Amino acid sequence: MSQQTPLAYAVAQWLQQSSTSVPADQKAKLQQAAKSVSEAFGVDTSSAEQQAQYGSGPGLQAIFDIFLKTQAKMGAAPAPAAASSSSTAPAAAAATPSDEDLAKAEQLKAEGNKAMSAKDYGAAIEAYGKAIELNPNSPVYFSNRAAAFSQIGQHDSAIDDAKQASKIDPKFGKAYSRLGHALFSSGRYQEAVEAYQKGVEVDPSNEVLKKGLAASKEQLSSSSSSNANDATASRGAADAVSAPSAGADAGAGAGGFPNFGGGAGGMPDLAAMMNNPMIAQMAQNLMSNPDSLASLMNNPMLRQAAERFGSGGGMPDMSSMMNDPALRDMARNFMGGAGRGAGGNGGNNMYG
């Protein structure tokens, strides 16, 4: 095995993975590039044997991210010979963007905003990234890219960008909104509370931050007692399954969805659901928007509910799930509603 083989495999794998989050006209180019690398070095990313041999590591993107973070930390460290008066100067001060770069960065930001409105999140991430390259001192660019990362479920990247935005400008309230949203969506409720709390301190009149803080506190309280309630909930679900049905309303109350006839054990009547125009529209939007579908499936609360239901734990508590601002945001979006939930990436919390 050549020493280049693992690297070639990682490059081909990264190209294929990247093709899922770019515009259609760029997808074919990335796939062709992956094919060329695979053929040139004799690697096959679809091979289970090569996957086990070369693909068990963290991946090329993760390794590169670690390199960038390490480089940033080393670059931010004060030089031993530096004068004390310069030790407090920002690291970026030596590379102040030119007026031309600033204007181009603003143009790229506008392109990213337009892509966000069109739900083309891959293009938005690319545009904001180019703007950051030209002007890394703008908290808005990092904040906007954090919103785009959240939309496709890349919450770790969103957290990094939101933290960088707050580091550049500690009084930029929207950075804490992005950070709280990404932390909440990752199931890190205590950290989400802290992020939203900091945001409320710097921007007391921001209703999005207040709602996000309230939702995070409620979810933190709920999640802290969920383990104690799991056994009781399972017994209650078993009783509901064995109890005789008292009609459609009883089915809905026994763990089913509201406003739909309940089937056995509180399961919703799927035929009735698909006859509902809002549910039909939501299903259609899900099928036509793979990025949002990926974000939905990455939501920790929804994933936990699905796992609990699959193991016989009964239907999830829909009212509790709708307290998750990320789920509420996506539900309104899929059903054609205007505005977003607390802590989300829309409504009064639009990108800059």
UniProtKB/Swiss-Prot annotation:
Which residues span the membrane?
none
What biological-process GO terms show up in the record?
Answer: post-translational protein targeting to endoplasmic reticulum membrane
Q: Which UniProt keywords apply?
A: Repeat, TPR repeat
Q: Reply yes or no: does the keyword Repeat apply.
A: yes
Gene3D superfamilies (alphabetical): 1.10.260.100, Tetratricopeptide repeat domain (1.25.40.10)
In residue numbers, the region (Disordered) covers 80-103, 217-236
Q: Where is the composition biased (Low complexity)?
A: 80-97
* TPR repeats mapped onto the chain: 105-138, 140-172, 173-206
What is an example of a GO molecular function annotated in this UniProt entry? molecular adaptor activity
User: Is Amino-acid biosynthesis included in the keywords of this UniProt record?
Assistant: no
* One Pfam family per UniProt: TPR_1
Among InterPro entries, the record links this protein to:
SGT, SGTA_dimer, TPR-like_helical_dom_sf, TPR_rpt
One GO cellular component assignment for this chain's record is:
membrane
Top-rank taxon of the source lineage equals Eukaryota
Q: Which family does it belong to?
A: Belongs to the SGT family.
Instruction: Summarize the protein's role.
Output: Co-chaperone that binds to the molecular chaperone Hsp70 and regulates Hsp70 ATPase activity.
Task: Please give the PANTHER family that the UniProt record associates with this protein.
Answer: LD24721P
What is the protein's given name?
A: Small glutamine-rich tetratricopeptide repeat-containing protein 2
- The organism of origin for this protein: Mycosarcoma maydis (Corn smut fungus)
